[in-house]
Amino acid sequence: MVLAAAARETSRIRLTSTVTVLSSADPVRVFEDFATLDLLSGGRAELTAGRGAYLESFPLFGVDLDRYDEYFEDRLDLLLHVAEHEVVDWQGTTRAPLSGAGV
């Protein structure tokens, strides 16, 4: 919401978050949010994805710390796949599969 407000009030600055923690976020929703912001801002949105360093909060999101690396790699793979395809067929290990999903 803050980035959308910045997009409305400015015309040249790049719009990005410090980091979007994919291990505890849904990559499809992250893509949709940033794609919408990019459209509304005339192509000024930039996404920075990361693993997250504050591990104590991960169990609150149902992330098993023993699978920490797997969560990030699996969700980054999905984020990149969604960015390249309008219709998504995908099956990973940390999220429900997608079949013919329009994004």
Question: Model-derived features: where do they sit?
Answer:
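Short active-site-proximal "capping" loops at secondary-structure junctions
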Residues: 1, 21-22
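Internal, glycine-rich beta/alpha segment that forms the wall or movable "lid"
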Residues: 23-103
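Structural preference for beta-strand elements that scaffold enzyme active sites
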Residues: 12-19, 44-48
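N-terminal beta1-alpha1-beta2 module of alpha/beta enzyme domains
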Residues: 1-14
